[in-house]
């Protein structure tokens, strides 16, 4: 009888640990802004080390607490949805500018702004196919009526930065999602035509409504995003 009672007590402990672990685990799926999201998780866990993350990059979102994707910004200001789709309990839109990144010796480096039609003959360093930002930037080019001449494609912001700094081409650079300014050797120029902005859409699903930690992290991520600003000297304004 005693071994049976001990087994029951152990099972209760295991079930409690399982429930506690689930309540302290955030299931996060994202298709954009991987650098920003990774850095925000590291920063968040520095003060909340007991919170765990299960991270995925999938088109399907049924099993996640939070999903982050990007969309081209059409409206003047980020939308504020009054009605949410079924299964969604919260949605935030985080807007950022998309700049043109050029080497310091580029003829465009001293420009205060640039029209994409002016760079139609330039070589571009681009993100690889399949990335949402790549599709958004392709749409910017279509709106400007240009077809970028790609000399290199990479899925790494660091590679884009290094190749632009080396003078091999120009590229697009998001204001915040890649973790701020690119650093020495790259100049960022605001694009005046077409308007080049995107929204990061952060969605919290109904399955997470009883997990306060998910709502807390979503608040933290939104604040973290707003703090990511480009330093003067890195951008031509």
Per-region residue spans from a language model:
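Flexible hinge/capping segments at coil-to-helix
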Residues: 84-98, 102-124
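Alpha-helical "hinge/linker" immediately C-terminal to small N-terminal DNA-binding modules
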Residues: 1-17
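Central regulatory/effector-binding core of bacterial HTH transcription factors
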Residues: 23-81
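Secondary-structure junction motif
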Residues: 108-109, 122-144, 210-214, 228-233
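Short beta-strand-to-loop elements that line the ligand-binding cleft
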Residues: 51-59, 127, 147-156
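A late-sequence structural motif
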Residues: 36, 186-231
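Alpha-to-beta junction loops
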Residues: 51, 67-76, 98, 146, ...
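Beta-alpha-beta core module
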Residues: 84-91, 95-97, 158-207
């Amino acid at each position: 009888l005693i071994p049976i009672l001990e087994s029951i007590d152990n099972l209760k402990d295991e079930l409690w640990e399982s429930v506690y672990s689930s309540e302290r685990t955030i299931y996060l799926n994202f298709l954009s802004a991987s650098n920003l999201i990774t850095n925000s998780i590291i920063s968040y866990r520095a003060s909340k080390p007991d919170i765990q993350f299960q991270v995925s990059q999938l088109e399907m979102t049924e099993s996640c607490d939070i999903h982050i994707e990007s969309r081209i910004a059409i409206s003047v200001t980020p939308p504020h949805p009054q009605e949410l789709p079924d299964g969604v309990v919260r949605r935030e839109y985080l807007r950022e500018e998309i700049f043109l990144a050029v080497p310091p010796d580029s003829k465009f480096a001293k420009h205060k702004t640039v029209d994409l039609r002016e760079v139609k003959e330039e070589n571009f360093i681009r993100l690889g196919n399949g990335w949402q930002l790549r599709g958004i930037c392709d749409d910017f080019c279509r709106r400007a009526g240009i077809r970028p001449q790609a000399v290199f494609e990479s899925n790494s912001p660091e590679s884009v930065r290094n190749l632009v700094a080396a003078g091999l081409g120009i590229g697009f650079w998001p204001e915040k999602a890649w973790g701020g300014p690119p650093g020495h050797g790259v100049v960022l120029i605001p694009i005046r035509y077409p308007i080049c902005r995107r929204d990061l859409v952060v969605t919290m699903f109904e399955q997470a409504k009883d997990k306060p930690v998910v709502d807390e992290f979503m608040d933290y991520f939104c604040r973290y995003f707003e703090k990511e600003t480009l330093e003067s000297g890195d951008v031509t304004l």
